Amino acid sequence: QLFTESVIDEVLLSMEKDDETSPDEILELFDLSQYRDRHPLSLSGGQKQRVAIASAVVSNREIIVFDEPTSGLDFKHMREVSRILKALANRGKTLLVITHDPELVMASCSYVIHMEKGQIKENYPLDVNGAKKVLNFFRI
């Protein structure tokens, strides 16, 4: 959900006051610099998605929930989101990624919790056997 009058304000809203990262660096990282002063609601679905992800990333929370983070993104930006998720995990962040995208699971996740009807059906590490389970689940 987007709350402010501009893309830059959306990022600033989530940033910690003592964060030394420039909000413009974050916009550049997410390929949003050209939309800096635009109202978030004037953006395409994929652009809005990237603004929301950028805001989550700069919030500096220990646990970040991503609900369908690649929804509405083109392939280039899907790969970039995957790279950013891995980088966040490598920095010690705990990420909960809710997705129906098997490529994102395989590229970005280390553990799978398979849910059905609000119940955990199965959970496993994304090792060789886990990867086979994911591919079988998505029938790939």
What are these regions (language model features)?
Residues 39-43, 47:
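Conserved ABC ATPase signature
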Residues 53:
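Hydrophobic anchor residue at the start of the ABC signature
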Residues 64-67:
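Catalytic Walker B motif of ABC-type/P-loop ATPase nucleotide-binding domains
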Residues 99-100:
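H-loop/switch region of ABC-family ATPase nucleotide-binding domains
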Residues 105-107:
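A short, surface-exposed alpha-helical micro-motif characterized by mixed small hydrophobic
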Residues 119-139:
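Conserved beta-strand-loop-alpha-helix hinge in the C-terminal portion
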